[in-house]
Amino acid sequence: MGRKWNNIKEKKAQKDKNTSRIYAKFGKEIYVAAKSGEPDPESNQNLRLVLERAKTYNVPRNIIDRAIDKAKGSDDENYDNLRYEGFGPNGSMLIVDALTNNVNRTASDVRAAFGKNGGNMGVSGSVSYMFDHTATFAFEGKSADEILEVLMEQDLDVRDVVDDGNLTIVYAEPDQFAQVQDALRQDGVEDFQVAEFEMLPQNDIQLSDEDKATLEGLIDALEDLEDVQNVYHNVDLDS
C-alpha cells in the first residue's frame, strides 16, 4: 500500500500549491463536461463527477459557474482528451493526461518536457499496462472495518479499504465512483480529502536522491504545461 498512500499525500499536497493552475485545469474540464451534455449535473453524470472532484480541491463557485455559463453559450471550442506515456530516470514510468484544443502543440510541449528533463516519450501502451485505473476516496472519521461493512450492505465490492493514519482510503472500480461516494455520504462522510480517478501503479520503485530530483523536475515541467491535467508515476518519492 506504500505507493498508494504516497499518492494520497501527493494529492493533498497539490491542494496547497499553485491553486490557480488547479482551478484553471478544473475550469477547462468542467466546460468540456458541460458542453458534452446538459449543463446541469442532475442530468449530466460526467459533469456531476467533475464537480464532485472539484469540491475536494475547493474550486471557487465563480470558476465553476463561469465554465458552465461558457458551455451554455455559443462558444464552440473543441477539446480532445489525450494520453502520453513515457519514461523517467532509471526505470521510472509516467502517464500524462492532457485536455487540449491543439493536439500538435500539446504533443510538442510534452515531448520537449520529457527530452529536456531526463526522460523520453514512449509509444501508446508502453507504460499504462503497469497501472490500474482506480476511483480513490480518502476521508476521516470512519474505520476501514466500518466502511467495508457499509459497502457490503450496498452490494459494492470495491478493490480495497484501508486505514492509514487518520485517514480511511477506499479504492474502487472507476465505474463505481458515484455509487461508492453516495454510499459513503449516506453513512455520514461529508468531507473528502480525496475523491479522484487515478492511475495507480501496480508496483512502485525507489530511486537514488539524484534520480528522484531529476524525476521531480520532469514532473514539475509536465504539470506546468497548460494542457496537462494529470501526471502519474510509479516512484516512491518518500523513500
Swiss-Prot record:
GO terms for biological process: regulation of DNA-templated transcription. It holds the Pfam family TACO1_YebC_N. One of its GO terms (molecular function) is DNA binding. It is found in: Cytoplasm. Keywords: Cytoplasm, DNA-binding, Transcription, Transcription regulation. GO terms for cellular component: cytosol. It comes from the Bacteria. Its main location: cytoplasm. Disulfide bonds: none annotated. Belongs to the TACO1 family. YeeN subfamily. This is Probable transcriptional regulatory protein Sca_0317. It comes from Staphylococcus carnosus (strain TM300). The lineage of its organism: Bacteria, Bacillati, Bacillota, Bacilli, Bacillales.
